[in-house]
Curated annotation (Swiss-Prot):
Pathway: Cofactor metabolism; pyridoxal 5'-phosphate salvage; pyridoxal 5'-phosphate from pyridoxamine 5'-phosphate: step 1/1; Cofactor metabolism; pyridoxal 5'-phosphate salvage; pyridoxal 5'-phosphate from pyridoxine 5'-phosphate: step 1/1. InterPro entries: Pyridox_Oxase, Pyridox_Oxase_CS, Pyridox_Oxase_N, Pyridoxamine_oxidase_dimer_C, Split_barrel_FMN-bd. This is Pyridoxine/pyridoxamine 5'-phosphate oxidase. It catalyses: pyridoxamine 5'-phosphate + O2 + H2O = pyridoxal 5'-phosphate + H2O2 + NH4(+); pyridoxine 5'-phosphate + O2 = pyridoxal 5'-phosphate + H2O2. Homodimer. GO terms for molecular function: FMN binding; pyridoxamine phosphate oxidase activity. It comes from the Bacteria. The keyword rRNA processing does not apply.
Amino acid sequence: MTDRDPIHDPAAMREHYRLEGLDETELAAHPMDQFTRWFAQAAQAAAQGVVYEPNAMVVSTADADGRPSSRTVLMKQYDEQGFVFYTNYDSRKARDLAANPYVSLLFPWHPMARQVVVTGLARRTGRDETAAYFRTRPHGSQLGAWASAQSSVIFSRAELDAAYEQLGVRYPEGEQVPVPPNWGGFRIAPQTVEFWQGRWNRLHDRLRYVAEPDGSWRVERLSP
């Protein structure tokens, strides 16, 4: 292609990243504590209109044959046990995780020149935990969980809207919506957590926590 507009040419796109670095001496002992620090800063940046949805993460899975797929979902909880998101258990990602529980998460905080990459194992949350979260969802989102047979082929948008409208009649605002039996959460127990900080001249800082058999974590610096 010789007529490519330079403005839209990915090879010509350049960004000079921030000067501040990330040093081993600044890290928390546990990766989830370090994540808490960075997530708080990302949330503050979101409040200032700099970052959009700091809890958005790219979830990458692979099926039993090793075929990968990725999608953006919203993290709804995190603690020392890992990261939690909710989905339809009939979706592609849930089917992948049933066959292959290894998963990767990516938090892309581009305006801050930061990203966090997590690898680990997924397991379903308990039904009590799922129900407790479902009750906090807006009424419309609760109906949406019933209306969408996620990842299935549908004839048209009108089909989806009609299903939603029927559910709205069945469960009007103010009436309790039951938790769909095929809907729930996954908790990702991290095995590695990498904190990436953009630096000048592409000499970025990459510090990765690696889980040890005794429950401790070691930190290693990766070449950019």
